[in-house]
From Swiss-Prot:
NCBIfam families for this protein: Obg_CgtA, Obg_CgtA_exten, PRK12296.1, PRK12297.1, PRK12299.1
Function comment: An essential GTPase which binds GTP, GDP and possibly (p)ppGpp with moderate affinity, with high nucleotide exchange rates and a fairly low GTP hydrolysis rate. Plays a role in control of the cell cycle, stress response, ribosome biogenesis and in those bacteria that undergo differentiation, in morphogenesis control.
Lineage, broadest ranks: Bacteria, Bacillati, Bacillota, Bacilli, Lactobacillales
Record localization: Cytoplasm
Keyword terms: Cytoplasm, GTP-binding, Hydrolase, Magnesium, Metal-binding, Nucleotide-binding
EC class name: hydrolase
Residues annotated to bind GTP: 165-172, 190-194, 212-215, 282-285, 314-316
InterPro entries: G_OBG, GTP-bd, GTP-bd_Obg/CgtA, GTP-bd_prot_GTP1/OBG_C_sf, GTP1-OBG_CS, GTP1_OBG_dom, GTP1_OBG_dom_sf, OBG_GTPase
SUPFAM superfamilies the record matches: Obg GTP-binding protein C-terminal domain (SSF102741), Obg GTP-binding protein N-terminal domain (SSF82051), P-loop containing nucleoside triphosphate hydrolases (SSF52540)
Protein name from the UniProt record: GTPase Obg
Organism this protein belongs to: Lacticaseibacillus paracasei (strain ATCC 334 / BCRC 17002 / CCUG 31169 / CIP 107868 / KCTC 3260 / NRRL B-441) (Lactobacillus paracasei)
Segments forming domain OCT: 350-428
């Protein structure tokens, strides 16, 4: 099993601003406030798409933003609610808050959804702020900011196809040709120290996951080299592509190589030998390779290996690669699935401790700076374009304990106070 992980940024839409407006119609002398509410901002919603197998699409787009709600209008007209931004993920995706480590959810069933960033509510228009003392309020709210966060998507991927063979037979090269994976490639044993994973996408829309499994050597089933670790990966694949190199100068016989790998696979688990297998002769661009392949193919046919399961390719010239991939996709259609044994997972309890609602600090120039989720939200929703709105915001600050907090921090009348990009003077 391989873990595919990616971090993405999500920004939900801001709510639409409420409107300050008054009813002005002929024969209606005291129409009163008629400012409508803003529309709700769009949320970011993940949903399970059973057609997806990997998180590959997130390699190309890692920032997602939903639309803002429409602003309120006069005549008590509400702003348009924004559409939610829906993002497809494969089944088995675990979603975690990148900053806190909190698991937001596990998406396992087709159609299952998870809201990862909630859209802001629309600000209220002035029709909501009528009181006996203020029958014509010039007060409205800006839309609430949408949630913004970084999330980690983690998917445990089972490879559909496993590339097996001796070291340096061309597994990593083939993977790099048929996928966008960039494995480390060199001509020495155990170049691949961890399995490389790639998605093969054919021109007919078919796709499957391919794993380049590190080269096996004699004794792998007894743990020689990195054998046992990699044989565990092999047992989870549905189809094997068994690569055998035809290089006349490698000092080995192709049929002996083929038999040795089959022996190690069988020694580890007989059931692996029952998996569908395509035999792939590699490095066919080398001089003398054609003659070696003719003898190798004849020996395989004599053993009962189907002719349409034997391929010759050159990853250098791409010869034979496309037919091999199409045959692999065809075999996969009828290949059974193999569920991995679930290992116990050790988990640690984690509880996120939110920041204090209000924090007062002082800049080098003497300005007192107010921070905290609650106060910043109140500021962003305050419409300070009208005196009534500014007075309402001042009352909100006082009710949150801002005045007392500033005094405790040493603020005196006339000192400057900043919230975000807004600066005002503290008055006792």
């Amino acid at each position: 099993m391989f873990v595919d992980q990616v971090q993405v940024e999500v920004q939900a839409g801001k709510g639409g601003d409420g409107m300050v407006a008054f009813r002005r119609e002929k024969f209606v002398p005291f129409g009163g406030p008629a400012g409508g509410d803003g529309g709700h901002g769009g949320s970011i919603i993940l949903y399970v798409d059973e057609g997806l197998r990997t998180l590959m699409d997130f390699r190309y787009q890692r920032h997602f933003k939903a639309s803002a709600g429409g602003n309120g209008q006069g005549k008590q007209m509400y702003g348009r609610a924004a559409e939610d931004r829906r993002i497809a993920v494969p089944a088995g995706t675990t979603v975690t808050d990148a900053d806190t480590g909190e698991v937001l959810g596990d998406l396992t069933e087709p159609g299952q959804t998870l809201v990862v960033a909630k859209g802001g509510r629309g600000g209220r228009g002035n029709m909501h702020f009528v009181s006996p003392k203020n029958t014509a309020p010039e007060i409205s709210e800006n839309g609430e900011p949408g949630e913004h966060r970084f999330i980690k998507l983690e998917l445990k991927v089972l490879a559909d196809v496993g590339l097996v063979g001796f070291p340096s037979v061309g597994k990593s090269t083939l993977l790099s040709v048929v996928t966008q994976a960039k494995p480390k490639i060199a001509a020495y044993q155990f170049t691949t120290l961890v399995p490389n994973l790639g998605m093969v996408q054919l021109d007919d829309g078919t796709d499957f996951v391919m794993a380049d499994l590190p080269g096996l050597i004699e004794g792998a089933s007894q743990g020689v080299g990195l054998g046992i670790q990699f044989l565990r990966h092999v047992e989870r694949t549905r189809v094997l592509l068994h690569l055998v190199e035809m290089d006349p100068d490698n000092g080995r016989e192709p049929l002996d190589d083929y038999d040795q790998i089959r022996k190690e696979l069988g020694a580890y688990d007989d059931n692996i030998l029952k998996r569908p297998e395509l035999v792939v002769a590699t490095k066919m661009d080398l001089p003398g390779a054609a003659e070696r392949f003719a003898d190798f193919k004849a020996a395989l046919l004599a053993r009962g290996v189907a002719a349409d399961h034997i391929f010759e390719i050159s990853s250098l010239t791409h010869r034979g690669v496309t037919p091999l991939m199409h045959k692999t996709a065809e075999v996969l259609k009828t290949a059974p699935h193999f569920e991995p044994k679930q290992a116990a997972v050790k988990t640690a309890d984690y509880k996120y401790q939110p920041e204090p609602a209000l924090k007062v600090t002082r800049d080098s120039d003497g300005t007192f700076v107010l921070t905290g989720d609650k106060i910043e939200r109140a500021f962003k929703m305050a419409n300070l374009d009208h005196e009534d709105g500014a007075m309402r915001f001042a009352r909100q600050l006082r009710s949150m304990g801002v005045d007392d907090a500033l005094r405790d921090a040493g603020a005196e009348s006339g000192d400057l106070v900043a919230i975000d990009d807004f600066t005002f003077e503290f008055v006792e």
